[in-house]
Amino acid sequence: FISQRSRISLSYNNPAKKLVFGATLQDVRTWGATDQANIGDKNNLGVHEFWGNIMFSEHFSTKVGRQELNYDNGRIIGRVDWSQQGRSFDAAVLKYLDTTSQIKIDFGLGYNTKSQTLLQEVYDLNNYKSMQFIWLNKKFKSFNASILFLNNGLEYTVNPTNPITISNRKIAYSQTIGGQVRI
């Protein structure tokens, strides 16, 4: 089989206004998996990234929207670019960067829902319902060290024999912490 991923990326950078925008569209398919006329399959082309980054000061910025997150070797939070479709996150990330002391800190939040409603609803997709993380990185003269803490909330059904309603759903949180030193 032949698997294909095609991406087109656009970016806009306005240093005077301290704004950066990025967008990536992608098409992932296996050759021959759809009709050649392909008028019925509407799931091939998708938005992989669509984000904006605002610099508040010399040290602080925030990046909001659908974006790739990739920290250290990508094992805890990564773009998994080894898979054809890759991975992006709907998140807001507050970033701190001090080039003098070589310190980076990223604090991110994500909250997923299936529709545009103010009411609480069942989230039965196989993604996190809520996610929070903090990544600390420091470059020293001879090595680079970082630590990542992730709080991941997955929604689940309490009693599978009962109807799937919001009262029969809970969020289970798991915490993961990991570090990396590169010499």
Give names to the regions the model predicted.
Residues 1-69, 92-99, 138-139, 182:
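Beta-barrel outer-membrane channel/assembly domains of diderm bacteria
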Residues 16, 29-35, 70-75, 113-117, ...:
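Gram-negative outer-membrane beta-barrel proteins
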Residues 37-40, 76-82:
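"Short basic amphipathic alpha-helical interaction patches in structured regions
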Residues 41, 71-74, 123-125:
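A short linear-motif detector with a strong N-terminal bias
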Residues 58-60, 80-183:
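Signature for the C-terminal beta-barrel architecture of outer-membrane proteins
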Residues 66, 73-74, 79, 86:
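Generic secondary-structure boundary/loop-capping signal
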